[in-house]
Amino acid sequence: IFGFVMVIGSLLKVPESLTVTNRESSSGLKTMFKNFKILLKTPRFVLPMLIQGMTFVILFTYISASPFIIQKIYGMTAIQFSWMFAGIGITLIISSQLTGYLVDFIDSQKLMRGMTMIQIIGVILVTIVLLNHWNFWILAIGFIILIAPVTGVATLGFTIAMDESSSGRGSSSRLLGLVQFLFGGVASPLV
């Protein structure tokens, strides 16, 4: 009910933020798919979009698999898992805030490259830990290295990709959202 009231309220009270002069002359599915085609031919848009999509694969597979890994393989209770999950969730907030601070001093593409490399290190570490059944604390550190950069990569990927789209910004935003959740949604049941 609350969601329905919010939708109605936003339709009635929130004004359109895009000025009439900046709106596209034609809209609809045909225009959206035409814009998708143009965007998918732009490597400087596609690369951040794919990196962002893979980051959501990491996030969604972590969310799907970690309860089973921690509770079934490592024998922890649901409460212990909840504390670990919350702690790693806090690293997402820290990463988001840190990204907002660092973007003033470091080029966003370099920052995204660095955060992506951190995630790759996390993937390698978590894989090695799980294959060798190493200590839980090493796994937790691996999860932190793997998951903490998600908010930074997602934000930077979106910003970098949107900077490359000169027209059809709505289509750009839709495509970015589609890819990240499509990749994540497809990966979740596979783990």
For every predicted segment, state its role.
Residues 95-110:
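Helix-to-loop junctions at the C-terminal end of transmembrane segments
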